[in-house]
From Swiss-Prot:
GO CC annotation terms, alphabetical: cytosol
Catalytic function, reaction form: 5-amino-1-(5-phospho-beta-D-ribosyl)imidazole + hydrogencarbonate + ATP = 5-carboxyamino-1-(5-phospho-D-ribosyl)imidazole + ADP + phosphate + 2 H(+)
Complexes and interactors: Homodimer.
Name recorded for this polypeptide: N5-carboxyaminoimidazole ribonucleotide synthase
Gene: purK
Amino acid sequence: MNFNKLKFGATIGIIGGGQLGKMMAQSAQKMGYKVAVLDPAEDCPCRYVAHEFIQAKYDDEKALNQLGQKCDVITYEFENISAQQLKLLCEKYNIPQGYQAIQLLQDRLTEKETLKSAGTKVVPFISVKESKDIDKAIETLGYPFIVKTRFGGYDGKGQVLINNEKDLQEGIKLIETSECVAEKYLNIKKEVSLTVTRGNNNQITYFPLQENEHRNQILFKTIVPARIDKIAEAKEQVNKIIQSIHFIGTFTVEFFIDSNNQLYVNEIAPRPHNSGHYSIEACDYSQFDTHILAVTGQSLPNSIELLKPAVMMNLLGKDLDLLENEFNEHPEWHLHIYGKSERKDSRKMGHMTVLTNDVNQTEQDMYAKFEGSN
């Protein structure tokens, strides 16, 4: 590796001190960089692996400038920072990711319109600004469809499935609280995602196609490589996206595959993503390694080698309650506990990756463990 752009000992600032920030910091440190993190939570996971911690809200202009003055480059671990605040920071400090992607992707309507104009295949959608617009959604999309808030929402929050007329009132309640987008509900055969890193010189590195399973709108499991031949098609869609949206660093595009085997772009995460965590053990570079290489101006690997097929399981609070006593009996479970102070049933507390020669058998073993049947 050649680190002739940002020298050893330089400081990387991270806005956001959750598990993604923590894993970014760990990659940065093994490459010889120092890390400063800003987060409002006194006990955020990244604090305990950073060289310097600034406790402040994400819209605290003074604290953000303090971070900028201390750091040679700034990155962010999530997309809920104010795009306008980020734009102002970009004018003064080195933030390779920029603010444009955040500005587009914070608004689901703008995201979908941008994806559509880029020529990607997206699920049919319509803007619903007020409750009377729901009639137009029924006429345009037909049942079933999903109503989602334009702003905010993650892990399934801020959305309502409308199966029939009986569900309309729940959708109207959501529309009355905020502007929304309605989109056609697909009969989904499989969910996949593609994690990508783009460097300053427009170099692009692709990770293997990831096959995902969600439960209650939270990622439950990722299998790599995906058990469906869609990698070329997914790359083609990503290549269209990066012509329209500025990305530097690691990002992930999530896709639906419907019952007719059609691939649709669902949404984009403009930073490292939960479905890419397997790469820490299963690939020669992790998604965090390539992210740090990109934002520090280094060359990216030409390709990512999958060292071994893998099954990655999210660990929610309820999973820790179920499995905590078994961890020491399974050294093949590569365990990552994020260090969050409060355990909650549906909160992401960690993840684990199992390298395997038989993903189907390992998948069944994990189902048995996580569903408490073995």
